Structures are given as structure tokens and as C-alpha cells.
A protein has these predicted regions:
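GST-like fold's C-terminal all-alpha helical module
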Residues: 122-231
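GST-like domain detector, emphasizing the conserved glutathione-binding G-site
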Residues: 18-148, 272, 279-282, 291, ...
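Short, structured interface segments
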Residues: 229-240
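Mixed-charge, Lys/Arg-rich low-complexity intrinsically disordered regions
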Residues: 242-272
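N-terminal amphipathic/basic-hydrophobic helices that include classical n-h-c signal peptides
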Residues: 1-22
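Contiguous C-terminal substrate-recognition/catalytic subdomains in enzyme active sites
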Residues: 222, 240-242
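Generic structural signal for secondary-structure transition and capping sites
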Residues: 102, 184-188, 238
């Protein structure tokens, strides 16, 4: 999506499940591409927890046949696979990693409401950064890449984007100013002495500026605490990474376990849909619509059953908020 290569990107780079997921035998497979700030968030989660993981590189633009098969049609980045379980969006990825590594530093350490608010805050900051990136690089992109980005972000008027838009720069400065103020409370990280989801969500956006938006770096450089924090986040690393091919993921799907499904409460408005064919899609961008059988739904998550390989079912976990369901006709 951005104007940097994968090598540069890589360099810069609620309950415990007992007896269900064995870290020694069930690999963490991240389907992603390095130049996405959302992939960088997931990679930093691995570094925060000191985890070993495998990377399957997905294409930057559609079609993405392997990940679309795995998810039932969703093609956003990143996607975390653990055996037969497939986790969509960094919100679900963070929860999954906290569950399988309960002894390590917690990502969602301060409660669901705060973590959800921080997730939404990061999404809001992404908008002016996205517009800055589109304005800076669209003239350099090949026609198929530009067409894909116009499809993914249909609400953006690509023809009116201004590289030096002062209002956009002011918005970025406002967001980063709140980070600087929080760091002024005297802790190494935004929530205290230990990095958590707050830092992860800010990291992806500040990484994007450092890596691909040099025109915005003068704004970052006016905030000294933010600069020091960025170095501390860099030092966390990205865990122990191994690059693998898609065949490894298919074998993990065949051999791996599936975690227990959550109960669907009787009070859940979508409870009558359980067992039916549904579609689910993100509301903020066109990342593809996933189709499958609704297995469970509650206030935190939606689980679909899909069949990436004939006779092999995957359980695909989506966040409940930010994604919209409809019954298939």
C-alpha cells in the first residue's frame, strides 16, 4: 500500500485455553504483507510477547486466492491462523494471543472498553494518514494497484487529494499531541511501565509515518517523548519469525485443533441465524465479504464455519463491532 519495500518494513519492524491449543505443536501463522501498518501492529504483538511465528505473504491487491479461501472471502491483512482457527482483524488477533500466552505480557491489559476505545482511536488516526499516503503515491502506482485501492476505499475522492493539505496535517498533529501528553505522565509506555494495546495501536500509525510519509515527519519530530517512545517500541522487536509457503498453512488446517465455540446467548438478536448461511463484511472499507455457516455469535465475536479445503472446516473469528452480517438469499 505504501511507498517502501518489504525489507525496510521488516527491519523497522477471556480465558486461558487449557489442553486445547499447545504452543509447542500449534504454530502461529500470520497471513500478511509487511508494508501494511496493520500487519506491523500484529508483528509488534509478537514482539511484545516474545512469540515464535510463521509468515505467509499475501498479495497486496486482489485477487488473494489463498487467504480468501481460508477466510471464506475476506482479504484484509493481517489474518492469524492457529490450526483450524482463523482470526480476523487485530482486535481478534490480540485476544487470541492473550489467551494462548496468558503468562506473557498482556496486550489487552486494561479491560475491554478501554481496549475497544483505543482500537477505534487508531482507526480514526489512520484516515488522515491514508489520505496522505494516497496523495503522495497514487501517481507512482500501476493502474491495477490504483484500481484496487479505489475499490477498497470507495469513499475517498482520489481526484481531490492534496499532498500538503494543511487541515490533514493539523489532524495528524492533534492526534500525536495527545500521545505526547500521555507520555508526559512519566511512564515509558502509554499505559504504564509495560507496553500493551494502547502502544500497539499507536505504533502502527507512527510506524506508517516513519516508513512512508516523510512529509509528516516534521510533525513527529516536534514531540520528543514520542520519539523516545518510538525507540522503545522498536526495541521490542517482532518475535521469532519464519517465512513459509501456503502449503504449511493448509497442513496446519488439516492437522490442527479447533478451540471451543462460545455460547450464543438466547438474548442475542442474531441467535436464530446460528446454523444458517451468512455473509459478513467490514463496514469501513471493502476488504471482501466472507461467506459461511454461522456457528456462534455474542457481544464480542462472530464465528463462521468455512471449508477452505474439501472436507476440512475452518472456524473464522470476526469482531462483533465494525463488521456487518446478513443472511444469504
Amino acid at each position: 500500500m505504501l511507498g517502501l519495500d518489504a525489507t525496510t518494513a521488516r527491519r523497522q519492524g477471556l480465558q486461558v485455553l487449557t489442553g486445547i491449543i499447545n504452543m509447542a505443536s500449534t504454530a502461529l501463522i500470520l497471513h500478511q504483507y509487511d508494508v501494511s501498518p496493520f500487519s506491523q501492529k500484529a508483528q509488534k504483538m509478537m514482539g511484545l510477547k516474545g512469540l515464535s511465528w510463521q509468515s505467509v505473504e499475501m498479495p497486496m491487491i486482489a485477487p488473494k486466492p489463498h487467504v480468501e479461501a481460508l477466510t471464506g472471502g475476506y482479504r484484509g491483512t493481517p489474518v492469524l491462523q492457529i490450526g483450524r482457527d482463523v482470526f480476523i482483524d487485530n482486535w481478534m488477533i490480540a485476544r487470541a494471543l492473550d489467551e494462548i500466552d496468558a503468562a506473557g505480557p498482556a496486550i489487552n491489559a486494561q479491560g475491554g472498553l478501554r481496549d475497544a476505545a483505543l482500537y477505534a482511536w487508531g482507526e480514526r488516526l489512520f484516515t488522515p494518514l491514508l489520505h496522505a499516503a494516497l496523495a503522495a503515491y497514487q501517481s507512482e502506482w500501476e493502474a491495477d494497484f490504483l484500481a484496487d485501492r479505489k475499490r477498497v476505499f470507495p469513499d475517498v475522492d482520489f481526484d481531490t487529494l492534496d499532498v500538503s493539505d494543511p487541515d490533514r496535517r493539523s489532524q495528524v498533529r492533534a492526534y500525536l499531541g495527545t500521545v505526547e501528553a500521555q507520555l508526559g505522565l512519566g511512564q515509558d509506555f502509554l499505559g504504564g511501565a509495560q507496553a500493551d494495546s494502547w502502544d500497539i495501536h499507536v505504533w502502527g500509525m507512527v510506524w506508517m509515518i516513519h516508513s512512508a510519509l516523510p512529509a509528516l515527519m516534521p510533525i513527529v519530530e516536534t514531540f520528543p517523548r514520542l520519539a523516545d517512545w518510538y525507540e522503545r517500541m522498536l526495541a521490542l522487536g517482532t518475535g521469532d519469525r519464519e517465512d513459509v509457503e501456503i502449503d504449511v498453512a493448509w497442513q496446519a488446517l488439516k492437522d490442527g485443533p479447533a478451540r471451543p465455540l462460545p455460547d450464543t446467548p438466547d438474548q442475542e438478536p442474531l441467535a436464530p441465524w446460528v446454523g444458517e448461511a451468512v455473509d459478513i463484511a467490514a463496514g469501513s472499507a471493502d476488504r471482501g465479504s466472507a461467506s459461511g455457516r454461522l456457528l456462534a455469535v455474542d457481544h464480542e465475536q462472530v464465528v463462521l464455519g468455512v471449508e477452505p479445503i474439501i472436507g476440512e472446516e475452518a472456524h473464522v473469528w470476526f469482531p462483533r463491532f465494525g463488521y456487518h452480517l446478513k443472511q444469504r438469499a
